[in-house]
Each structure stands twice: as structure tokens, then as C-alpha cells.
UniProtKB/Swiss-Prot annotation:
Glycans are attached at N30, N46, N249, N424, N496. This is Hemagglutinin. The record marks R342, G343 as: Cleavage. It comes from Influenza A virus (strain A/Chicken/Victoria/1/1985 H7N7). Its main location: virion. One of its GO terms (molecular function) is host cell surface receptor binding.
Length: 563
């Protein structure tokens, strides 16, 4: 029992005030919450937004060849109604359509017009070439009051073919055009549906009318349908415009006996452009690459929540209004000095959770105390290593989204040319895919950033531990108690990775021998106390048994066993 009293006295009497160096990381009082693959609302030191929500309410055209069609509808640049006379040939990389724009003058429609619009929006402008068609025995100057210039006129790029005189027979004719260029040609023709059978006879003579159009990959016959219809622009008749893309060295042939609106010129495309439908004004003083009906999106972010129908070099549209990308480490706000001890590598996460709000010069750093006082310094090497790996995360995220979604976008662009309005449904489906992938990509990057920051912290800890070796002891709070006097120069050598443990080894070993026997945690004290108590009890029992045995042997004690 005297042994127990001696140990307790030594523990209470001997006190160590060793020099100490601690490792920690930058922290802020209020961080930003992000989502990772495994957890939502993880607080980090800093983060950046990846979803653009702002737009410029103007069409920015600085540095671009932009064409504002105004009252001219996009399809009108092919046929040439009066409102489109100034746009029959042009070059542009941005085509702006307005709601007031009209494709026709004489009432009618374009067949498969959405596909044709898509082609023209991407055309880069057009130039034209005459078909070279000549006619005899008919009139080629049909006009209408619906298409007015100085007076009645017609589509500038079309010929309205009529009988030589009213009610006269229209002769059977065949006309052919061969595309001799090394690029596709766009050819448009019309079928006239008169307001009545009487009007059709007056214009084209009596009898059934038939128009046949054929090329190597196109064959179609048309029969006009005369009949009463509501008047539009003073006309009850209609013209249906049809079109085809004629490949190089291919020939298209038209056979007809009336009710045919013939092409006078064919169109060729000049390059690449994009088209937008918008009512906002044009601004030649600002630049842009991404447009929508409400203006221009100027952003380097990978995603946008402005408009799902934006065109050009645009961030990908997602449903989320915000997706924060972590650009800093996990935030652990600084705890007051009398804080609960945290485990180091014994903890589940293995992360040194020492957040220091005063560490502003770097992500990772040191605090020390010695005879000269206390100090704090950042570790620039580990900080730079982490920054180098995190810098460019936003650009890498943009690359991932472009590579992942561009193929889908191109695939559905082809579908749009074929089935027109079905693209509205497919785009909604694509938005769902983009939104899911955006969420996943940002969460993956955030997970990587946090894991990376943890890794750099642990690397720094291991670097210090390997330097100090047996000259110091870990205290399970991210600190090392040093068993020798370590002035500011010594502390600097630990931080700079130039510490020589052999220089201080002898002093450290001497101090370790003095400190170790009495530097016991409460758990070890309990073990020693119980061991000492057990040993004392065993010794007393052995003495008692020895006395009993001697008494029995000498006859001073008798033991009787009764059964």
C-alpha cells in the first residue's frame, strides 16, 4: 500500500511544461454548405457558384455579322416576298427573327417548315443561282395584290405560271435543273390551290392538274385542291411551298400542266450561323456567344438556369438554381481553448480537426509554444499543393459537361430536322438528364476536394512526425510535445522540413526517461492501482497461509476435517 501512495505522490508532484508544436488548418466563422456524394450540407471554407442565373436583356452583337430580319420571316429569304427584298442574299453568323416577321405575302404555308427553319438558322447566309428555266406559250408574270411593291407583284424568287390567256389550255411542260456545284442546293416550288374551280380554269384552263417532282432521292406528285376558303390578305386561294435539298451533280425534274409556282433561283449556303427568335433590342457595344429570346447570357460557368432554349456556346441548362462547387477545405470552426480532445488517427475520419480562424496566409499551418512564447505560421508547400490540384476545377467541370452532353445535343438536333416539334419533348427529357448529371458531377468534385484537403493535412502531419521521431510524443489533438528545448529557430526547422532529430536526441532521451514514468493517463493509473491492490492482497494471503502451516507443523494448531 505504501507503493500506491508513493506513485500517486510522484504523479501529483512532478509537472512537465514541454515545448509543443501543433498542426491545423484554416477555418472561418461561417462557411458555405455544399453537397457531396455521401452527405448534404457539408460546410466548407469557400465555394463558387456553377449555375448562371443572370442575363443581359439585349442581343449583344459586337464582333459579329448579325442580321435583324425585322418584318421578314426567315423562310421568306428563300421565296422573296416584298418585306424580304433586302435579305435575298446575305452573309451572317447571327440571324435574328422577330415576332412581326412574315414568311409569305400571298397566303399559304411551307411544308415541313420547322426543319427548313433549322437549316436556314445554321446556314451562315445564302447566295443564289438562276435555274435557267425558259418558257413559251404561257405567261410567267403572274402577280397579286397580296404582294405589293409599287403595285401588285409576286415573290421575287418565284415565277407564277399562267395560261397564255384566260381560260386557255395550259400546255404540258417539263423543266430540269442540275446542281453543278460541289455543295447542296435548296430548291423551293409552290402548288397553287385556287379559291374556286372557276378561278382555276380561268388561270390554267380546264381539266385535271398534276405536278410531279423527282430527283435521285425524291419523288412526289401533287394535285391542286381548288375550293372556297376564308380570305387572307384579300385572297381565298393558297400556295403550299415544298422544298428539297439537291445534292451535287444531281438533277431535279418538274413536270406540270398548271397550278405550278416555279423556282426562278436556287439557294446555296455560305457557312455556319445560329438563329434566335427575340423581341429585345440589338446592342452592338457588348459581346456574347449565348443567346435566348430574352437576351444574352455572358458567363463562364458550366450551367445556367435562365432559358432551356438558349443557343450558341452556352452553359448547359439545368433545373437547379444553384450548385455550389467547393474550392476550399471542410470548415471546422475554431473551438475555445478548453475544448474536448479530438482523436487524431484513432478517429474514424482520420482528419485533424483543428480549425484556426487566425490562419489567413495559407490553408495549413503550425502553432507552437516554447520559452520564447507562442507563434503561428502557414505552411505554403502543402497549401500550394492543394491549391494547384483544386485550381481549374471549374474549367474541368465545363470540359466534362461539354464532352458529356455535346453528343446528346447533336443527336437530337438530327431528330429535330426530321420530326420538328417532337424536339420540345426530347429537350425536356434532356434537361432531366443534364440536371441529374450536373448534380452528380458537382457532388463528385466536392467529394474529391474535401478528401484532397484531408489528404494534404495528413501528409503534413506525417512529415512532422517523421522528423521528430522519438524526440517528441503525439498528444492525440494534432500536437507534438517535444522532449527538448526548442527555440524559435528549432520550431522553424520543423516547419521547413530541415529539423535534424539527431542534434537533440540525447537531451530528448534524458527528458523522456524523467517524464515517462510519471506521465500517466488516468487509465494507466487505474491499472497500476488495481495491480498494486491485488499484489498486496496476495502477499497478505501468502503470509497468513505460511503462519497457519507453521503452527500446524509445530503442533500449536490442529486441523480436523469432518465428513
Amino acid at each position: 500500500m505504501n507503493t500506491q501512495i508513493l506513485i500517486l505522490t510522484l504523479v501529483a508532484a512532478i509537472h512537465t511544461n514541454a515545448d509543443k508544436i501543433c498542426l491545423g488548418h484554416h477555418a472561418v466563422s461561417n462557411g458555405t454548405k455544399v453537397n457531396t456524394l455521401t452527405e448534404r450540407g457539408v460546410e466548407v471554407v469557400n465555394a463558387t457558384e456553377t449555375v448562371e442565373r443572370r442575363t443581359i436583356p439585349r442581343i449583344c452583337t459586337k464582333g459579329k455579322k448579325a442580321i435583324d430580319l425585322g418584318q421578314c420571316g426567315l423562310l421568306g429569304i428563300i421565296t422573296g416576298p416584298p418585306q424580304c427584298d433586302q435579305f435575298l442574299e446575305f452573309t451572317a453568323d447571327l440571324i435574328i427573327e422577330r415576332r412581326e416577321g412574315n414568311d409569305v405575302c400571298y397566303p399559304g404555308k411551307f411544308v415541313n417548315e420547322e426543319a427548313l427553319r433549322q437549316i436556314l438558322r445554321e446556314s451562315g447566309g445564302i447566295n443564289k443561282e438562276t435555274t435557267g428555266f425558259t418558257y413559251s406559250g404561257i405567261r410567267t408574270n403572274g402577280v397579286t395584290s397580296a404582294c405589293r411593291r409599287l403595285g401588285s407583284s409576286f415573290y421575287a424568287e418565284m415565277k407564277w405560271l399562267l395560261s397564255n390567256t384566260d381560260n386557255a389550255a395550259f400546255p404540258q411542260m417539263t423543266k430540269s435543273y442540275k446542281n453543278t456545284r460541289n455543295e447542296p442546293a435548296l430548291i423551293v416550288w409552290g402548288i397553287h390551290h385556287s379559291g374556286s374551280a372557276t378561278e382555276q380554269t380561268k388561270l390554267y384552263g380546264s381539266g385535271n392538274k398534276l405536278i410531279t417532282v423527282g430527283s435521285s432521292n425524291y419523288q412526289q406528285s401533287f394535285v391542286p385542291s381548288p375550293g372556297a376558303r376564308p380570305q387572307v390578305n384579300g385572297q381565298s386561294g393558297r400556295i403550299d411551298f415544298h422544298w428539297l435539298i439537291l445534292n451535287p451533280n444531281d438533277t431535279v425534274t418538274f413536270s406540270f400542266n398548271g397550278a405550278f409556282v416555279a423556282p426562278d433561283r436556287v439557294s446555296f449556303f455560305k457557312g455556319k450561323s445560329m438563329g434566335i427568335q427575340s423581341e429585345v433590342p440589338v446592342d452592338t457595344n457588348c459581346e456574347g456567344e449565348c443567346y435566348h429570346n430574352g437576351g444574352t447570357i455572358t458567363s463562364n460557368l458550366p450551367f445556367q438556369n435562365v432559358n432551356s432554349r438558349a443557343v450558341g456556346k452556352c452553359p448547359r441548362y439545368v433545373k437547379q438554381k444553384s450548385l455550389l462547387l467547393a474550392t476550399g477545405m471542410k470548415n471546422v470552426p475554431e473551438i475555445p481553448k478548453k475544448r474536448e480532445k479530438r482523436g487524431l488517427f484513432g478517429a474514424i475520419a482520420g482528419f485533424i480537426e483543428n480549425g484556426w480562424e487566425g490562419l489567413v496566409d495559407g490553408w495549413y499551418g503550425f502553432r507552437h509554444q516554447n520559452a520564447q512564447g507562442e507563434g503561428t505560421a502557414a505552411d505554403y508547400k502543402s497549401t500550394q499543393s492543394a491549391i494547384d490540384q483544386i485550381t481549374g476545377k471549374l474549367n474541368r467541370l465545363i470540359e466534362k459537361t461539354n464532352q458529356q452532353f455535346e453528343l446528346i445535343d447533336n443527336e437530337f438536333t438530327e431528330v429535330e430536322k426530321q420530326i420538328g416539334n417532337v424536339i420540345n419533348w426530347t429537350r425536356d427529357s434532356i434537361t432531366e438528364v443534364w440536371s441529374y448529371n450536373a448534380d452528380l458531377l458537382v457532388a463528385m468534385e466536392n467529394q474529391h476536394t474535401i478528401d484532397l484537403a484531408d489528404s494534404e493535412m495528413n501528409k503534413l502531419y506525417e512529415r512532422v512526425r517523421r522528423q521528430l521521431r522519438e524526440n517528441a510524443e503525439e498528444d492525440c489533438t494534432g500536437c507534438f510535445e517535444i522532449f527538448h528545448k526548442c527555440d524559435d529557430d528549432c520550431m522553424a526547422s520543423i516547419r521547413n522540413n530541415t529539423y535534424d532529430h539527431s542534434t537533440y536526441r540525447e537531451e530528448a532521451m534524458q527528458n523522456r526517461v524523467k517524464i515517462d514514468p510519471v506521465k500517466l493517463s488516468s487509465g494507466y493509473k487505474d491499472v497500476i492501482l488495481w495491480f498494486s491492490l491485488g499484489a498486496s492482497c496476495f502477499l497478505l494471503l501468502a503470509i497468513a497461509m505460511g503462519l497457519v502451516f507453521m503452527c500446524v507443523k509445530n503442533g500449536n494448531m490442529r486441523c480436523t476435517i469432518c465428513i
